[in-house]
Regions:
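C-terminal regulatory/oligomerization modules of transcriptional regulators
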Residues: 1, 125-159
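N-terminal leader segment of winged-helix/HTH proteins
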Residues: 1-33
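Short amphipathic alpha-helical segments with heptad-repeat character
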Residues: 6-9, 13, 17, 61, ...
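A structural signal for well-ordered alpha-helices, especially hydrophobic packing surfaces
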Residues: 16, 50, 104, 139-143
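N-terminal helix-turn-helix DNA-binding core of bacterial DNA-binding proteins
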Residues: 22-65
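Short, hydrophobic-biased segments on the C-terminal half of alpha helices
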Residues: 53, 71-72
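Charged, amphipathic alpha-helical coiled-coil/dimerization segments
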Residues: 72-130
Length: 159
């Protein structure tokens, strides 16, 4: 299990980098040059919602990128709209602009193409469900380790 555990960690990291490269290629093929792959993933995670930068940070993994910086760049390039909360002036909420919604649709079509290709026998739906379940357990384990400290050993997985 030692080798498998370390291999999974390395695989998750490689998959994330490869997927970001796929997003970059998609942006290039669409002629979109004013947003990078990480920003496009942040944009995709916003979708049709409105949220704070803090909420956005919790929703996705952006390889240690500065989400606030990326939000600022997307604002400058017209992909998002930023509004102060009427209840708490310190809180800023973001949502996609029309330009952002257009790119979101392009990203959604990319995901749909990928799913169609995968369904041709590359990966079965049950395989994705099983991988998702296992990765969620790892996520809960690592979250527990962070919350309890690096030496935390007692962990009871949720079903």
């Amino acid at each position: 299990m030692d080798a498998a555990y370390l291999d999974v960690i390395a695989l998750v990291e490689r998959l994330h980098r490869q997927f970001l490269e796929v997003v970059k290629l998609e942006l290039d093929s669409q002629g979109v040059h004013d947003i990078n792959n990480v920003q496009a993933m942040i944009l995709f995670n916003i979708g049709d919602l409105e949220m704070t930068v803090g909420e956005l940070t919790l929703r996705g993994c952006y390889l240690g990128s500065n989400v606030s910086y990326n939000v600022k760049k997307m604002l400058e390039n017209g992909y998002i709209v930023q509004e102060r909360s009427s209840h708490d002036r310190r809180s800023v909420r973001v949502r996609l602009s029309d330009k952002g919604l257009e790119l979101h649709q392009k990203m959604k079509r990319m995901h749909e193409r990928h799913l169609a290709s995968l369904s041709q026998g590359v990966v079965q739906a049950d395989d994705l469900v099983s991988a998702h379940r296992t990765l969620r357990r790892l996520e809960r384990f690592w979250t527990h380790a962070v919350e309890m400290g690096a030496r935390a050993t007692a962990f009871t997985p949720a079903a």
